[in-house]
């Protein structure tokens, strides 16, 4: 289970019908165009551990985000990497270019790419595992991508940014990791289906790509980080700005997920508390002050487990609040346990019609 298919479902797009890969959705966020016959991939900056001098296959996936590397450092590293003669020659033969992105998240676009049968593993689902069984496989093009990853592992450790990160006790971005391949994306129009236009506030390219493809406005907040320390007040204010002119706003918070991938229970709890105290409560209060009726949907796109830092596919609890209904409603608090006794939906695709009372 991934955020790509889950968030598509939340916006009413059945992933079984429309999903063709995560990277094309993120490419749409940047306004990029998929070349005919080409493919896009996520290109993560990652940290690999293991004994010094160990074969590449014996390395360990320590961090899918290179220790939540900052955007400026990450962009500089990936741009430098693709400019190094040995790496650039491999990338040119592969007809592959990079589009620097958000934090550890970059995109690679390949002309005339054959991805039939390719197997690329999501790094966040395999933390602290040996990478040998996770390396690209399944077709000749997988070997091309693997060659680029091997070369990156040779070159990146020596970059001054990584030396500086190590000196500061941070994880270096010592490799790249290709995954989330896809050929193209087209999604049904949200305003036409639900009779409401608006915007999506997020620090994550995936959400902005889905927004653009369904006909909603991607809204960026300069002080949003995509981590537990994001600017919650600014994201709430951005949603209120959208709702001043439109009928729909979505706020995406990545903090709980990233904290869990990093086995950081303290900041996972903190992020959830901030959702309640610094987003939901002030948002509702401001809308009431405006004298507007509204409905509010709160949910996570998927579960992420502290035990292993990986995603889970079991159903998530959701809550719908209607400002016009002042009665007790279900009388249940919003918890995983109470969610088990609430109305069960077979698919996330059913949520948006439920929010709009369709």
Regions found by a protein language model. Name each.
Residues 22-159:
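A contiguous, mid-domain pocket- or channel-lining segment that forms the substrate-recognition surface
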Residues 116, 183-267:
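Anion-binding catalytic surfaces of enzymes that hydrolyze or transfer phosphate/sulfate esters
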Residues 222, 252-255, 264, 276, ...:
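Active-site proximal loops enriched in glycine and acidic residues that flank catalytic Cys/His/Asp
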Residues 51-63, 110-134, 214, 236-283:
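Active-site His/acidic residue clusters
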Residues 1-83, 310-313, 319-322, 328-358:
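Active-site nucleophile/metal-coordination loop of metallo-enzymes that catalyze phosphate/sulfate
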Residues 271-314:
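Metal-dependent active-site segment of extracytoplasmic phospho-/sulfohydrolases and closely related
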Residues 91-99, 159-171, 221, 248-249, ...:
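Flexible, glycine/charged-enriched surface loops at secondary-structure junctions
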